[in-house]
Curated annotation (Swiss-Prot):
Position of sequence motif Cx10C motif: 30-41
Keyword entries, A-Z: Disulfide bond, Phosphoprotein
Keyword Plastid applies: no
GO BP field: leukocyte differentiation; mitochondrial cytochrome c oxidase assembly; multicellular organism growth; spleen development; thymus development
Family: Belongs to the PET191 family.
PANTHER family xrefs: CYTOCHROME C OXIDASE ASSEMBLY FACTOR 5
The protein's name in its UniProt record: Cytochrome c oxidase assembly factor 5
Pfam families in alphabetical order: Pet191_N
Short sequence motif named Cx9C motif, residue ranges: 47-57
Gene name for this UniProt entry: COA5
Length: 74
């Protein structure tokens, strides 16, 4: 779920997806209850949809076709 804040400055490409991925990992049971690091929880498969969205956004920055279509993500 995207979280938009009007008073936040623009962070660059894929910043919204990156921020939401970080929040998802920090609020997951893996981090809160099991005490693991967000990196370990990401490798275990938590927040898969946001991880995939972040990957697609980063990949679209390298894709030559995206210059005309725009970046994927928000």
């Amino acid at each position: 779920m995207p979280r938009y804040y009007e008073d936040k400055p623009e962070g660059g490409a894929c910043a919204g997806v990156k921020e939401d991925l970080g929040l998802c990992l920090l609020q997951s049971d893996c981090v809160l209850k099991e005490g693991k690091s967000p990196r370990q929880c990401l490798k275990e498969g938590n927040c898969k949809a946001l991880k995939y969205s972040f990957f697609e956004c980063k990949r679209s920055m390298l894709d030559a076709r995206s210059r005309f279509r725009g970046r994927k993500g928000y």
